[in-house]
From Swiss-Prot:
Acidic residues biased stretches: 65-74
Residue positions, PTM Phosphoserine: 64
Tissue: Ubiquitously expressed at low levels throughout development and in adult tissues.
Cellular component, GO annotation: nuclear envelope; nuclear matrix
Gene3D superfamilies the UniProt entry points to: 1.25.40.420, Potassium Channel Kv1.1, Chain A (3.30.710.10)
Region described as Disordered: 1-37, 63-83
Subunit and partners: Interacts with TMPO-Beta, TSG101 and TFDP2. Interacts with EMD.
Protein's organism: Mus musculus
Coiled-coil parts of chain: none
Function: Possible function in spermatogenesis. Enhances the degradation of MDM2 and increases the amount of p53 probably by modulating the nucleocytoplasmic transport.
Name of protein: Germ cell-less protein-like 1
Length: 524
């Protein structure tokens, strides 16, 4: 129902005129009766005070009478065109109060969850649920009292109150804490407008406290756009804003999607993804743990160390307790973990990942290294999106404030020592060969290519994306010690802290036949 109100906008530059008063227009009138009653005086500059008739004729200026008449006419015209604002009582509010809250002239009663609502069929027909009920051959179409069965445990009395009330008013205020219950009621009653409003409320209020509940509810009630938005939030925040509370709530199925995605906003390197998974698995197994994020890794390592002593010779993911988590760990890109010596040692010592998984990846990387050294491998020459999505190196960096930064990500990258610089709003890639020290071997080939994608993002306090830039997948060919600007940032879009995430592919994918493809192998 639309609220009735009258609102007319004034022309620009025009102010509301005051009500006309006696003597307006510049003529001064005496308030006392006497010989001057009905007359006025002229106070023209340089002239004597002269008595004037009620016609306000000025002998100093014979044309003044005509001017005054014209001014008075203009004034009246202005008054006629000056809007007057008068707020009318809202029809919508009247209907909501009188018909819904007071139940006046009700022709049907709806009973549910021990509560009763005195409503009106003509309003209920806005609901697809009741429209079908009243227009068909259902026995309820002729009943004055209808008992509703509520099979959905998310629906409560308050949610039904909001859902029924939405039929009698234009706008509904929805609290984020109540949106799931209201959505459930709206879906049951087939209230499309309310369902849409619930969806918008959910998308606007995604946070660490709401994201998992919203994701589950969006899947239950078919809000694909909300589900997609929640997944995007998780991809952006899982690693950048780690949370004990979030780790506890994330299900195995959701975590599998996140870890398998090339859009996961990784901070540092793939080893940090493994560490996050280890902490998440501990909290899934010990949900009663209530320490801080700083304490979490230490407690996690202690817990798994105790387990390791009891199950010597068996990796955790091979046990009955660990098997449910194996599908998530399979999505780790282990080739970028074992390429760093310190990380390789940790993953061996933890005894979480089956040795067969690691053996397959060691073999794969050894053969790739031989190709790079002996087969004139110069890197990817074309965009292979499938390979980039599934096997690219994921890494990132947080820039706390504006300034100059230069860094490299650790690990063996087939002789391509990539230096990344941020300075003066530019991001620069440099292929280092001889100019700067490098801990590993460096390829001296004249040219080397890499496939990459660069993404930048800033987030507000709730983890919502407030600005972002991305390059898309590209091929970059660099000569020895050559550097290249890969992104120039608009200072207006720079909001710190700034998060940088990259995907890299340093060598072209090996041509594999169907016979040697192994989907269960995490290295492929």
């Amino acid at each position: 129902m639309g609220a009735l109100s009258s609102r007319v906008l004034r022309p620009a530059g025009r102010t509301e005129q005051p009500e006309p008063t006696p003597g307006a227009g510049g003529a001064a009138r005496r308030s006392d009766a006497g010989e001057d009653a009905g007359h006025s005086f002229c106070y023209c500059p340089g002239g004597r005070k002269r008595k004037r008739s009620s016609g306000t004729f000025c002998y100093c200026h014979p044309d003044s009478e005509t001017d005054d008449d014209e001014d008075e006419g203009d004034e009246q015209q202005r008054l006629l065109n000056t809007p007057r604002r008068k707020k009318l009582k809202s029809t919508s509010k009247y209907i909501y109060q009188t018909l819904f809250l007071n139940g006046e002239n009700s022709d049907i009663k709806i009973c549910a969850l021990g509560e009763e609502w005195s409503l009106h069929k003509i309003y209920l027909c806005q609901s697809g649920y009741f429209s079908s009920m009243f227009s068909g051959s259902w026995k309820e179409s002729s009943m004055n009292i209808i008992e509703l069965e509520i099979p959905d445990q998310n629906i409560d009395i308050e949610a039904l109150q909001v859902a029924f009330g939405s039929l009698y008013r234009d706008d509904v205020l929805i609290k984020p804490s109540r949106v799931v219950a209201i959505l459930a009621a709206a879906c049951m009653l087939q209230l499309d407008g309310l369902i849409q409003q619930c969806g918008e409320t959910m998308k606007e209020t995604i946070s660490v406290r709401t994201v998992c509940g919203y994701y589950t509810s969006a899947g239950t009630y078919g809000l694909d756009s909300v589900k997609k938005k929640c997944l995007e939030w998780l991809l952006n925040n899982l690693m950048t804003h780690q949370s004990v509370e979030l780790f506890k709530e994330l299900s195995i199925n959701v975590m599998k999607q996140l870890i398998g995605s090339s859009n996961l906003f990784v901070m540092q390197v793939e080893m940090d993804v493994y560490t996050a998974l280890k902490k998440w698995m501990f909290l899934q197994l010990v949900p009663s743990w209530n320490g801080s994020l700083k304490q979490l890794l230490t407690e996690t390592d202690v817990w798994f160390s105790k387990w390791k002593k009891d199950f010597e010779g068996t990796t955790f993911l091979e046990t009955e307790q660990g098997k449910p988590f194996a599908p998530v760990f399979r999505h780790l890109r282990l080739q970028y973990i074992i390429s760093d010596l310190a990380s390789a040692r940790i993953i061996e010592q933890d005894s979480l990942v089956p040795s067969e998984w690691l053996a397959a990846v060691y073999k794969q990387q050894w053969l790739a290294m031989l190709r790079a050294e002996q087969d004139s491998e110069v890197g990817p020459q074309e965009i292979n999106k499938e390979e980039l999505e599934g096997n690219s190196m994921r890494c990132g960096r947080k820039l706390a404030k504006d300034g100059e930064y230069c860094w490299r990500w650790t690990g063996f990258n087939f002789g391509f020592d990539l230096l990344v610089t941020y300075t003066n709003r530019y991001i620069i890639f440099k292929r280092n060969t001889l100019n700067q020290p490098c801990s590993g071997s460096v390829s001296l080939q004249p040219r080397r290519s890499i496939a990459f994608r660069l993404r930048l993002a800033s987030f507000d306090s709730s983890g919502k994306l407030i600005c972002s830039r991305a390059t898309g997948y590209q091929i970059l060919t660099l000569e020895k010690d050559q550097e290249q600007v890969v992104m120039n940032l608009d200072s207006r879009l720079l909001i710190f802290p700034l998060y940088i995430c990259c995907n890299f592919l340093y060598i072209s994918p090996e041509k594999r036949t169907e016979s040697n493809r192994h989907p269960e192998n995490p290295g492929h």
